[in-house]
Regions:
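Amphipathic, charge-rich alpha-helical segments that serve as recognition/docking helices
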Residues: 45, 89-174, 197
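Residue-level marker for well-ordered alpha-helical positions
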Residues: 54, 85, 149, 175-176
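Short linear clamp-binding motif
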Residues: 1-22, 260-264, 268-285
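Charged, low-complexity intrinsically disordered regulatory/assembly segments
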Residues: 286-291
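Short polybasic/polar patches that bind polyanions
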Residues: 61, 92, 156, 182-183
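Short, charged/polar connector segments at secondary-structure boundaries
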Residues: 1-104, 115-121
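Amphipathic alpha-helical extensions and coiled-coil-like segments
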Residues: 33, 132-139, 162-279
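Glutamine-centric residue-chemistry signal
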Residues: 43, 65-67, 121, 144, ...
């Protein structure tokens, strides 16, 4: 294989690839045929031929690739792209045959962490992409034996908390239709997280209801579905009943004193009676929601 090597010096290069310095020497950039590139296994991020890609292609035609990608050699031949999938696609569309890259030997876990961290801060990432990426990085860090709070460590590159990372990873438990609904904002992320605790079959019932009735699932409804599922009480008719409930306009409700007087000691004043009523209503509400 013929490789044309060229050392490229870029301003701020060390800031972009902090670990590209080995033994005090700059890592060498090589130009490789893009025909030898392979997509990262289970790559979670889209590479779309959209308006932004058109802008990237124009830049590549005018200036070339200013920031090298990162690849690793494969035992089967060729190179797996770790960072630079969009640049690779832009090269294809621009008619370029080669692309500047850093070639590194690294483990699957190391490659996964770099792949996620170099993509996670993009502005146009879908919830499903971030969910899959965070899960991949979390699993990689577990295999590496990383110490400390892993969820927090996973979110560091994107400036997100460990709790937020957990919520995203939960979304990977959704069936494809519901995950797509989260991406398209038909279902909120908060609702999607709660629905992720339902079984695949139960999620199918939910999707059928959303698809046929165009219902907007509220957080309280999702919480109720989750609670019923946990107790093994959820079935198709109940899903429909929970999701199809509509808020009714209520007028003022007045209960005559004579109707409730016999239920309270004669010594109870109005405030004490109201407190008991509110407590009982709250307990009733929780039973209705299956909490």
């Amino acid at each position: 294989m013929n490789k044309r090597k060229a050392v490229i010096s870029l301003a701020g290069y060390e800031d972009i690839f902090e670990d590209s310095m080995e033994n005090g020497e700059r890592e060498e950039v090589v130009r490789l045929p893009i025909s030898q590139f392979h997509m990262f296994r289970n790559h979670p991020f889209r590479v779309v031929d959209d308006e932004k890609m058109e802008e990237t292609v124009k830049s590549v035609k005018q200036y070339g690739i200013l920031i090298p990608g990162i690849v690793r050699p494969l035992n089967t031949g060729g190179y797996e792209v770790i960072a630079g999938h969009r640049r690779w696609r832009a090269c294809e569309l621009a008619g370029l045959k080669e692309m500047p890259v850093l070639v590194r030997n690294m483990t699957d876990e190391e490659a996964t962490v770099i792949m996620v961290d170099t993509n996670i801060q993009r502005e146009d990432i879908l919830p499903s992409e971030k969910a899959k990426a965070y899960k991949m990085k979390y699993e990689a860090m577990k295999h590496q034996g990383s110490k400390g709070e892993k969820f927090t460590a996973v979110g560091e590159a994107a400036g997100e908390s460990g709790r937020t990372v957990q919520r995203y990873i939960r979304l990977t438990e959704l069936i494809a239709e519901l995950l797509d609904a989260v991406d398209h904002k038909v279902i909120s992320m908060k609702v999607g997280e709660k629905l992720s605790y339902l079984s695949v079959e139960e999620q199918g019932w939910v999707w059928d209801c959303v698809k046929t009735s165009s219902v907007q699932i509220q957080d309280r409804q999702a919480e109720c579905l989750k609670a019923q599922s946990k107790q093994g009480l959820l079935y198709p008719a109940m899903v429909q009943d929970i999701l199809m409930k509509k808020t009714r306009s209520r007028g003022q409700v007045t209960i005559p004193e004579k109707r409730i007087a016999d239920y309270f000691p004669a010594t109870y004043n109005k405030q004490q009676i109201e407190e008991v009523i509110y407590l009982l209503l709250e307990q009733w509400k929780k039973r209705q929601e299956g909490v």
